[in-house]
From Swiss-Prot:
Pfam families: EFG_C, EFG_III, EFG_IV, GTP_EFTU, GTP_EFTU_D2
Cellular localisation: Cytoplasm
Protein family: Belongs to the TRAFAC class translation factor GTPase superfamily. Classic translation factor GTPase family. EF-G/EF-2 subfamily.
UniProt keyword annotations, A-Z: Cytoplasm, Elongation factor, GTP-binding, Nucleotide-binding, Protein biosynthesis
Residues in tr-type G domain copies: 10-286
Known role: Catalyzes the GTP-dependent ribosomal translocation step during translation elongation. During this step, the ribosome changes from the pre-translocational (PRE) to the post-translocational (POST) state as the newly formed A-site-bound peptidyl-tRNA and P-site-bound deacylated tRNA move to the P and E sites, respectively. Catalyzes the coordinated movement of the two tRNA molecules, the mRNA and conformational changes in the ribosome.
Gene source species: Nocardia farcinica (strain IFM 10152)
Name this polypeptide is given: Elongation factor G
Amino acid sequence: MAQDVLTDLKKVRNIGIMAHIDAGKTTTTERILFYTGVNYKIGETHDGASTTDWMEQEQERGITITSAAVTCFWNQNQINIIDTPGHVDFTVEVERSLRVLDGAVAVFDGKEGVEPQSEQVWRQADKYDVPRICFVNKMDKLGADFYFTVQTIKDRLGARPLVIQLPIGAEDTFEGVVDLVEMNAKVWTGETKLGEKYEVKEIPADLAEKAEQYRQELLEAVAESDEALLDKFFGGEELTIDEIKGAIRKMTVNSEAYPVLCGSAFKNKGVQPMLDAVIDYLPSPLDVENVEGHVPGKEDEVINRRPSADEPFAALAFKIAVHPFFGKLTYIRVYSGKVDSGAQVINATKGKKERLGKLFQMHANKENPVPEVSAGHIYAVIGLKDTTTGDTLCDPQNQIVLESMTFPDPVIEVSIEPKTKSDQEKLGTAIQKLAEEDPTFSVKLDPETGQTVIGGMGELHLDILVDRMKREFKVEANVGKPQVAYRETITKTVEKLEYTHKKQTGGSGQFAKVIIALEPFVGEDGAHYEFENKVTGGRVPKEYIPSVDAGAQDAMQYGVLAGYPLVNLKVTLLDGAYHDVDSSEMAFKIAGAQALKEAARKAGPVILEPMMAVEVITPEDYMGDVIGDLNSRRGQIQAMEERSGARVVKALVPLSEMFGYIGDLRSKTQGRANYSMVFDSYAEVPANVSKEIIAKATGE
């Protein structure tokens, strides 16, 4: 059976489940695995037994951190699911999984509607143009409102929802759904506690009118999408179920509309029809545009690959995980071709040969060995030495580099000091392994204190990384307080700065002269730095020019005000001079570094701080206190709105002012308000704050 599917890509779906942190995403995934026969016991996030939450910490905290890839079968179709985390500190995991998906199920909380994090994940899915269906979950919850949630999909996401189901009852009385395509009711009765079976009945009388109204809206949308159906519809003819499904599929695959279904995963209602919708409406690998890449080293030479086993092999590594027995597991999405276990391929991103070891299809953290990998599927590979997230693996004779992924810089750091010499060695191993898995995890040595400093996307992200060092790698260490990852930049242009590096003390000397210009710069793709060479007539020999560039980049690691990394600048090498005997790569590297430092001091240097987009949801009574508190934290209020009886305040607030915020917010609102925050941008700090930061950093 599985082998037949491998050859028929029409029957394959590569999907993700995406949502806000508590919308019930992991529970929904668990139910899918249960109904597709992979799981024999339903795992519950509440009791820490979920299949996809397979790291110890995920089970303790009840949140999904790493996206496990799970394969299951439904009605002769194969579904590969990537479970993505919903907590904002793990957006990199979400980006990574969206890159390799063909479609997604967006899960919403039926009471809360579209929440800040669901909005952010939705925007990321827009970026990768991923077709989606929407599942309004938790319909059994007090205050659940399907129609409100559909409205928030329109209002907050600016998306076009296509309602294809209506709920029967809500809260305690939620018992099933009205299917607007087949015009029947699917009801889960109390007899099958686990919801494996449901009854197909007539639509309840009290819903008949509403069902007819929504059915009409659905048919109009369907007819508008296809001229032949439009003629038929206005000619008074009935559209067949297949015609309706075909039109919905076309609209979904083209991201013109998003089918909306509902249910309660926790109460085992509505999951099977959602699985049917995954098959009916989300794209197979054949429906997605051919993957695009370029010739290694030649970005303007574009190559396309079809999702076919006959094409040359090309795959993207999208996740690294450390497995307790096998060591490093690399998750890959194969876009074209097929290749056997043991085959030699090339990592075209790094230009290095790799041999594919054992190949698996994964079921959370259980493995199913396979003899080969083939286009359109997701696998885990053992034995890749140099491959990291975002690298392309391909046929050595037909090389291609697929588009890579860009990851944000860390915004928060902590120092970590091993307790003993043996801990120091373990820390080295832990850092290397964790950095392989997570491109948003950064490591550096503080030159003043000699301490190791690690950086990440938020407090929870760093907590979990430190926790993993202690648990998985048995590192005993003292961890400092979280610190903000400030940056430095320049505000003025320095048109000409001359620097000569000269050392002549017996033996061979050192000589290098450079003249540079320095100006503020931000690249289109968010790049922080650019180097341009304008030297003519060999006044600086060609072989020394990369050294000037390297020196400038080295100097950017430690800024001129408080030692924070310098960003957003362009260096132009205008002129220079060299000496036949005393010039060297090292001399020009030193000259490049010193010239950059001197120019930066004259270019109006300033300190930048990470600004967070904060959203507070509070009862009306505490609105004044919440706004006053945000203002006292240097917050800029961006918007205020009403949401399901509460008030929502949106603000931009410096990260440095947000430490310990949850405690203050709870005491001000008697525990009734909550908040979420995501990194927004870097902004210049006010002069008085800048003075404090510099004084603290320089110890003055």
